[in-house]
């Protein structure tokens, strides 16, 4: 079959079609060829069908790019085990295949599939499952191979008789090899079970006489745990428990003849090395005995008693504690009298306990002995009086007294209450009430710190009322609020009230005077109110009104107002007549303007419009309608002036929440110049809600369409699609679509399109897992500008490995991306760690931090820190910091190296190496950039030598050599000093002759002009010396008094020449203990001092050395400007458990100091802290610290004095359930701050977080909680400093309503809706709240015929003058008893609320009342009339009451 078409048109020049097919029983095929201009399409298909094998193929050739050659094949062959089912698809160069094979035989089954595709990760995937039940061992094997990665699970086992053997092999850590074995021997009545995995094993064995459990784990604290229970006799047992080296044994033996038990316990725990208990109980005599010992401290308890109608029990407790050597206790309980008494006392102290309760009250007494002062508490409480006293040694409550008295007389009631703390009265209350005299008096005083508060209330009938609230604070003085009311005349019928109100809390203080005059004696009631808020400002209100008692549906009133500024509404009058609800009239006059209204006025409907005689005055609408007939509703409300009215209407059919057809509108008073009108219709079919509608607002109009809303309540998910068109600029076409899923996740996807501008919200928190997760949230809103129009946040973590962890957070803002990644790997004991932090920020740039350290061996420890930052300008900032420490018995090395690309400091190195064998050698120094300072020091038995190199001009190299011989009678010191080509030498000799005489000689040569040559020699005898002195060309000979001191290791010579300036030569040398390493405290090892003619030079070497510490300090000063001071200090503890190290170097004004601290802590922990400061840089000291204590990790970082932060963290359950720790910030006064964070997963889709922070300052605490589930988020923060704060984001949908909320503290965005659809009641409630401003629309109508009806339409808004509008009513008529209540709320300040209430009994009488409340002014008509009808007449009384002091009573017959 073929078809050809040729035309002259370019669009369709040629069209040809040809088709052929073959149709046989075994094979069917068809081919279709289409030619369109120069494009050719070929489609072919074949089909082979049979009961055991079939094959379907389809092939297409098209000119479309990407689909030029397509092939599809689907086949099955139940006789082909390798390809039971096969599907192959190829599109151009892309091929997909899926092949399923397998077979089932007796006790053998195999299933497998292969998948090939061009998709990444699935190019080649194979799955094989095999079950073999043919042998005694049953086997199950499952394997999955993807991209060459093979994961296999093998299960094998056997179950023969009463024996089970199960084996499992998996690729999962902890379950690589898993075995379970169980055996049950019924004849021996025994059971044995065993379970093993890669890291541990557990076994359980038991029979009727014993039960044994044994477990081995890889954990250090529970390497081996076992317990065993054995029955040793009738009623006798032995139990033993062990954990590593800790154990406990329990034995209990029963004496059948005496019905008693003996109990023995022995154990060994850390802290309780020996614990033993022995006990006995005799059930017949009600006697008990218990003896125990902890670390040889024995405690014994014995007791006996009787149980009848009364319970008596006595007990004696003997303890090793001083104040409780022997304690005797007695318990008595009388059930009939409901009385109980417990009393205990000690023979060795004042300890006493009494607790007694009976019908008359409660009595308690407690004395807790203490060497400083006992603590004593006494309590006596009855209904009419009570007293509580406490005395203690604690400052906050050294003396406490609370006492009360109550007197309940027939006509008079009095009460008083007082509380005193530490001798100061903090609370006092007096109350008195006298009913016959109509007197009430209340006085309350409170004292808190220096604040005194007084509350006073006093009333005497209608003649006097006083109220006072006063507060006295020394800082602010006295402030009070006071009201004084004085009455006169025959109140409440006729009289006056004078009112004075004072308020000094406000600034300035304010006094208000008011007078109220009432006359209720005449037919026309009069009320006059005069108010003076301040001097010369008087407001007067005169009200006269009358209402016909026989026809209360009509009446009139007159109100005259006098104000200081003569307002136009000084005179107000009016009348009303609502006898005929369908033709009601209301008239009232304000000033010269009269308003009239006429129309229908009922609770269900009103057509009233208030119009004025003044053409310029606006009409006022008082219109409403509330009608309902089945599913049809007609609600309308229109209130307010013509230019500012509010409107709400809703008409249509509401079958249920899923089937609605309505039209409505609303206008929010003056805030909306036009009415917003709308129509809406939606319905539900097959679980999908669809709808449409229109809207109009002024010149704007449009339509909308709900394409679908499909919700799955069980899975807590839904999808929706909505669109709208309008003539609003930039919003001609708007569409919203998306879905949400809260089933074990938080997934929200919303797309909003407005005239081609697309906004998107994509939140995917589906991976809530404590060990690993990856969650994303994306928001795309073009209105936010190019920077934030698209925001995407991804947070992930991996804590699945016990030692290797990572955290990642990525944030994308528009085209920029910021992230932070942290990874670390550490040892089990945290002795070693490698980690890095990588981050990118649009504000800080890119930075990378690498940290590595090894503290496993403090004798060979090192740490490295690498820092690299690229700023937003492209500049790179980087540095490396390395620290090493090595030590042996006779050698110590410390080195710290700093390298950076900083211009101020590119390189720095500080080091100190020491050898302390027979000769002590020290090599230390400091390098920075191209400058170096080094010191080589050698200490021998009689010699000290050193070389100092510096970068300072003139001091490039300094060499010093000191030789001492200070033993014997002849002493000498030789010193040489060389700085460049400048040399100085010093020789001193001293000879002693006996104890009182001797000679000395000193020679000094220097390159300094002031002392190129110095020679001193002399002889002394009995502290008198003859001296020869020569300095350069100055020569002197003199006699004088000499002060000479000499010992085995030192000498000190000083004398005063005629010039008066002292000359002193001193030297000391004692280094043997230092070389031997036997010192234990700092001492002077060597010194040399020289003073002459006001010049001085001092040198000293201090130190000591032993196996635990090396301390060396060199200190030199001179009066010469070139070398004022040199200081070097090395202090290093060699103890590997705890050590402090210090390195200090000072050369004139140059300083460099390093302080290190290291200590071992409990549970194989440690802490290391280093502080570095130098004049090389203006930066303050740098402080770095890290450590571990058990599971707690500690980090310190800071700069300068007290400008450091120490932070520690301790994981809970390997950080799976939370963490805790401490924080020290001394710079702001917070030390020892403790925090605790708990997070848990109560359900699959619940996350709960709780944070507690103890500021360790006057008990201040901070608490915060966070809860996430499928309905939203709740969070709370409580702090004495920050206050209480809360955050809420919730939503809930139910068949009868919905709720949504987003809130922070008192600021809320809320929307709540409810639907009531019952047989007799229908209603709708919509509630909204925006930042504390509440909106509410509440409607309800319920009818049960003439017996009962109720209805309401209430509108709450935050708008001024329209806070509450609408009304409500209830009506009931049962057995001729009528109860009715109605309220009307108007948008008016003069008449905001009108309330009416009726309660009548019409059963052969008219008994009840009718109440009308207009703006707080209440009118009540009470009647009590007896009779059967109006024609026969009624007998009784009518009374009329108002809130104005008046009453009218009419009695008689009618």
UniProtKB/Swiss-Prot annotation:
Which GO biological process categories is it annotated with? cell surface pattern recognition receptor signaling pathway; innate immune response; lipid transport; regulation of innate immune response
What this chain does, per the record? Involved in the recognition of invading microorganisms. Binds specifically to beta-1,3-glucan and activates the prophenoloxidase cascade.
| An annotated GO cellular component | extracellular region
Q: What is the reported tissue distribution?
A: Expressed in the hepatopancreas and secreted into the hemolymph. Expressed at lower levels in muscle, pleopod and gill tissue.
Q: Which family does it belong to?
A: Belongs to the glycosyl hydrolase 16 family.
Keywords linked to the UniProt accession: Glycoprotein, Immunity, Innate immunity, Lipid transport, Secreted, Transport
Where in or outside the cell is it found?
Answer: Secreted
GO MF entries: pattern recognition receptor activity
Keyword Disulfide bond found: no
Q: How does it assemble?
A: Monomer.
UniProt keyword DNA-binding, yes or no: no
Propeptide residues according to the Swiss-Prot or TrEMBL record: 1-197
Query: Which residues carry a glycan?
Result: 33, 55, 185, 571, 592, 825, 882, 1153
Name this polypeptide is given: Beta-1,3-glucan-binding protein
């Amino acid at each position: 079959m073929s078809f050809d078409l040729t035309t002259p048109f370019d669009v369709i020049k040629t069209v040809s079609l040809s088709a052929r097919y073959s149709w046989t029983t075994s094979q069917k095929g068809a081919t279709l060829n289409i030619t369109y201009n120069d494009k050719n399409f070929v489609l072919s298909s074949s089909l082979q069908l049979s009961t055991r094998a079939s094959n379907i193929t389809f092939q297409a050739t098209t000119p479309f790019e990407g689909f030029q050659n397509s092939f599809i094949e689907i086949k099955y062959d139940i006789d082909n085990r390798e390809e039971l089912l096969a599907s192959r698809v190829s599109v151009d160069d892309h091929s997909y295949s899926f092949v399923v094979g397998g077979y089932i035989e007796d006790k053998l089954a195999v299933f497998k599939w292969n998948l090939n595709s061009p998709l990444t990760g699935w190019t080649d995937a194979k799955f094989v499952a095999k079950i073999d039940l043919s042998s005694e061992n049953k086997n199950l094997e499952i394997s999955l191979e993807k991209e060459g990665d093979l994961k296999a699970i093998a299960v094998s086992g056997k179950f023969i008789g009463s024996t089970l053997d199960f084996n499992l092999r998996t690729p999962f850590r902890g379950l690589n090899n898993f075995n379970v074995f169980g055996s049950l021997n019924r004849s021996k009545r025994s059971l044995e079970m065993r379970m093993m995995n890669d890291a541990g094993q557990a076994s359980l064995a038991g029979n009727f006489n014993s039960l044994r459990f044994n477990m081995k784990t890889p954990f250090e604290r529970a390497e081996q745990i076992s317990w065993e229970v054995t029955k040793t006799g009738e009623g006798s047992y032995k139990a033993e428990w062990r954990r590593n080296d800790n154990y406990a044994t329990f034995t209990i033996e029963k004496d059948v003849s005496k019905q008693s038990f003996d109990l023995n316990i022995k154990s060994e725990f850390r802290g309780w090395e020996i614990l033993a208990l022995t006990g006995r109980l005799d059930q017949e005599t009600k006697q008990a005995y218990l003896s125990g010992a902890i670390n040889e401290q024995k405690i014994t308890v014995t007791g006996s008693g009787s149980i009848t109608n009364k319970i008596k029990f006595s007990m004696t407790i003997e303890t090793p504690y001083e104040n409780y050597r022997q304690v005797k206790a007695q318990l008595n309980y009388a059930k009939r009298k409901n009385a109980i008494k417990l009393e205990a006392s000690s023979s060795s102290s004042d300890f006493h306990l009494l607790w007694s309760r009976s019908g008359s009250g409660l009595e308690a007494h407690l004395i807790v002995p203490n060497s400083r002062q006992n603590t004593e508490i006494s309590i006596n409480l009855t209904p009419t009086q009570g007293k509580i006293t406490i005395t203690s040694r604690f400052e906050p409550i050294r003396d406490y007294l609370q006492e009360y008295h109550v007197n309940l007389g027939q006509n008079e009631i009095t009460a008083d209450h007082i509380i005193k703390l530490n001798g100061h009265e903090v609370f006092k209350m007096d109350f008195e009430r006298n009913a016959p005299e109509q007197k009430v008096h209340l006085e309350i005083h409170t004292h808190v710190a220096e604040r005194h508060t007084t509350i006073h209330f006093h009333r005497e009938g209608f003649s006097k009322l006083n109220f006072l609230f006063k507060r006295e604070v020394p800082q602010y003085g006295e402030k009070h609020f006071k009201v004084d009311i004085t009455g006169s005349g025959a109140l409440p019928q006729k009289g006056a009230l004078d009112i004075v109100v004072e308020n000094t809390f406000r600034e300035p203080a304010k006094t208000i005077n008011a007078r109220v005059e009432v006359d209720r004696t005449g037919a026309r009631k009069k009320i006059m109110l005069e108010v003076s808020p301040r001097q010369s400002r008087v407001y007067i209100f005169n009200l006269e009104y009358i209402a016909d008692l026989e026809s209360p549906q009509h009446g009139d009133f007159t109100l005259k107002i006098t104000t200081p500024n003569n307002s136009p509404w000084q005179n107000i009058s009016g009348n009303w007549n609502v006898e005929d609800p369908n033709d009601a009239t209301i008239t009232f006059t304000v000033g010269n303007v009269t308003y009239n209204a006429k129309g229908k006025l009922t609770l269900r409907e009103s057509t009233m419009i208030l119009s004025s005689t003044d053409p310029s005055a606006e009409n006022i609408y008082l219109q409403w309608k509330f009608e309902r007939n089945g599913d049809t509703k007609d609600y309308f409300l229109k209130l307010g002036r013509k230019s500012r009215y509010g409107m709400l209407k809703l008409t249509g059919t509401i079958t249920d929440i899923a089937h609605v057809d309505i039209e409505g509108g609303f206008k929010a008073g003056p805030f909306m110049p036009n009415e917003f009108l709308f129509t809406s219709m939606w319905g539900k079919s097959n679980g999908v809600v669809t709808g449409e509608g229109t809207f109009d607002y002024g010149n704007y109009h449009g339509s909308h369409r709900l394409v679908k809303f499909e919700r799955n309540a069980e899975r807590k998910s839904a999808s929706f699609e909505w669109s709208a068109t309008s003539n609003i600029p930039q919003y001609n076409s708007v569409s919203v679509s998306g879905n949400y899923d809260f089933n074990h996740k938080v997934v929200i996807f919303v797309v909003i399109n407005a005239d081609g501008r697309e906004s998107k919200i994509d939140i995917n928190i589906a991976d809530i897992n404590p060990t690993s997760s990856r969650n994303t949230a994306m928001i795309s809103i073009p209105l936010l500008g190019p920077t934030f129009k698209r925001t995407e946040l991804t947070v992930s973590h991996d804590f699945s490995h016990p030692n290797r962890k990572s955290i990642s957070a990525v944030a994308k803002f528009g085209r920029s991306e910021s992230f932070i990644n942290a990874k670390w790997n550490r040892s089990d004991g945290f002795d070693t760690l490698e980690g890095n932090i990588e981050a990118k920020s649009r504000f800080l740039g890119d930075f990378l931090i690498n940290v590595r350290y090894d503290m496993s061996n403090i004798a060979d420890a090192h740490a490295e820190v690498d820092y690299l930052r690229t700023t937003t300008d492209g500049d790179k900032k980087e540095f490396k910091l390395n620290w090493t420490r090595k030590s042996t018995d006779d050698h110590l090395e410390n080195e710290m190296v700093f390298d950076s690309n900083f211009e101020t400091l590119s390189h720095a190195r500080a080091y100190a190496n020491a050898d302390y064998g027979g000769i002590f050698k020290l090599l230390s120094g400091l390098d920075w950039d191209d400058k170096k300072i080094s010191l080589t020091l050698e200490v021998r038995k009689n010699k000290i030598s050193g070389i100092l190199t510096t970068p300072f001009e003139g001091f490039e190299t300094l060499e010093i050599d000191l030789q001492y011989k200070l033993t014997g009678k002849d002493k000498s010191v030789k010193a040489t000093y060389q700085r460049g080509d400048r040399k100085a030498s010093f020789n001193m000799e001293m000879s002693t002759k006996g104890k009182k005489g001797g000679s000395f000689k000193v020679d000094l040569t220097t390159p300094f002009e002031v002392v190129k040559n110095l020679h001193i020699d002399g002889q002394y005898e009995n502290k008198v010396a003859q001296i020869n002195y020569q300095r350069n060309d100055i020569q002197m000979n003199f006699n004088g008094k000499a002060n000479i001191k000499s010992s085995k290791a030192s000498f000190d010579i000083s004398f005063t020449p005629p010039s008066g300036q002292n000359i002193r030569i001193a030297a000391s040398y004692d280094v043997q203990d230092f070389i031997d390493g036997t010192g234990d405290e700092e001492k002077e090892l060597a010194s040399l001092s020289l003073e002459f003619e006001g010049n001085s030079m001092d040198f000293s070497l201090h130190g000591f050395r032993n196996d635990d510490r090396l301390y060396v300090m060199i200190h030199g000063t001179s009066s010469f400007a070139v070398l004022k001071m040199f200081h070097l200090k090395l202090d290093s503890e060699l103890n590997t458990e705890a050590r402090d190290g210090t390195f200090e170097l000072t050369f004139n004004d140059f300083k460099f100091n390093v302080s290190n601290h290291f200590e071992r802590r409990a549970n194989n922990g440690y802490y290391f802290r280093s502080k570095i400061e130098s004049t090389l840089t203006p930066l303050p000291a740098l402080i770095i610290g890290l450590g571990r204590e058990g599971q707690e990790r500690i980090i310190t970082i800071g700069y300068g004095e007290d400008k450091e932060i120490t932070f520690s963290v301790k994981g809970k359950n390997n950080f799976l359930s939370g963490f805790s720790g401490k924080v020290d910030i001394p710079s702001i006064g917070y030390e020892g701050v403790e925090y605790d964070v708990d997070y848990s997963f109560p359900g699959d889709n619940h996350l709960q977080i709780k944070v507690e922070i103890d500021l360790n300052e006057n008990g201040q605490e901070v608490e915060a909680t966070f809860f996430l589930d499928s309905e939203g988020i709740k969070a709370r923060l409580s702090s004495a400093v920050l206050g209480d704060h809360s955050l809420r984001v919730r939503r809930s949908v139910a068949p009868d309503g919905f709720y949504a909320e987003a809130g922070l503290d008192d600021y809320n965005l809320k929307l709540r809706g409810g639907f009531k659809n019952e047989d007799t009641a229908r209603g709708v409630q919509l509630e909204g709240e925006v930042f504390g401003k509440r909106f509410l629309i509440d409607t309800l109508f319920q009818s049960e015929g003439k017996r009962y009806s109720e209805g309401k339409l209430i509108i709450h808004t935050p708008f001024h003058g329209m806070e509450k509008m609408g009304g409500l009513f209830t009506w009931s008529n049962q057995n001729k008893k009528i109860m009715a209540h109605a309220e009307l709320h108007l948008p008016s300040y003069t008449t905001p609320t009108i309330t009416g209430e009726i309660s009548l009994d019409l059963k052969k009488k008219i008994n009840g009342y009718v109440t009308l409340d207009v703006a707080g002014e209440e009118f009540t008509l009470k009647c009590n009339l007896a009779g059967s009808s109006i024609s026969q007449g009624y007998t009784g009384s009518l009374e009329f009451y108002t809130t104005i002091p008046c009453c009218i009573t009419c009695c008689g017959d009618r």
